[in-house]
Amino acid sequence: MFVLFTAWNYQVTVLEILAVVASLIGVWLGTTGTRITWPWWIVSSSLYAVLFYNFELYASAILQFVFIVAAIWGWFGWGKDGAQPSKLAMKEKTIWFVISLISWLTLAPLLAQIGAAATWFDSFILVGSVVAQVLMVKEKYEAWPIWVVVNMVATFHYARQELRFTSLLYSVFIIIAIIGWRKWLKKAII
């Protein structure tokens, strides 16, 4: 990978910088509920798929393809007026939680079998992100608190994997997710 510069003994590649910038733009636009967020998700996810694969973070690489599919779904699902946030019923919250827990506990051992770099963290990020992304596409404000938790885990995880700028990005995502949570909660249709 082409190194753009070195910061704090860390080689920053062009690929990682482009992925970080595209991700920041896409996630910030998501807080506004505007449909233009989705093309940015496609660009950033394409870049991160390559980066994560190169670091043997296979679940994170696969997740990027899920994001691309969700971005296409979101583009058509949100329509020209953007997101109209609503809340999940308690039964729906319980179902999503159980599905998430079972998926995480099932996926981590499978990743270990194929030699992934960090199975439990990587699988948690994959499962949590898929759930949050689906809820975001479905315009549910509960997507944002899930993003807060996933981004906290991802910040720690990517720092341990020596992806420092990506770790920094996810720490910024925590703040953006809190902002998105507040904005969407105010607009949520009860």
Region locations from a protein language model:
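Alpha-helical membrane segments and adjacent membrane-interface helices in multi-pass membrane proteins
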Residues: 41-78
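Long, highly hydrophobic alpha-helical transmembrane signal-anchor segments
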Residues: 21-50
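Alpha-helical interaction segments
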Residues: 38, 57, 134-137
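Hydrophobic alpha-helical membrane segments of integral membrane proteins
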Residues: 39-43, 61-65, 145-149, 167-169
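Polytopic alpha-helical membrane-helix bundles and their juxtamembrane interface segments
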Residues: 1-32, 78-82, 90-145, 149-190
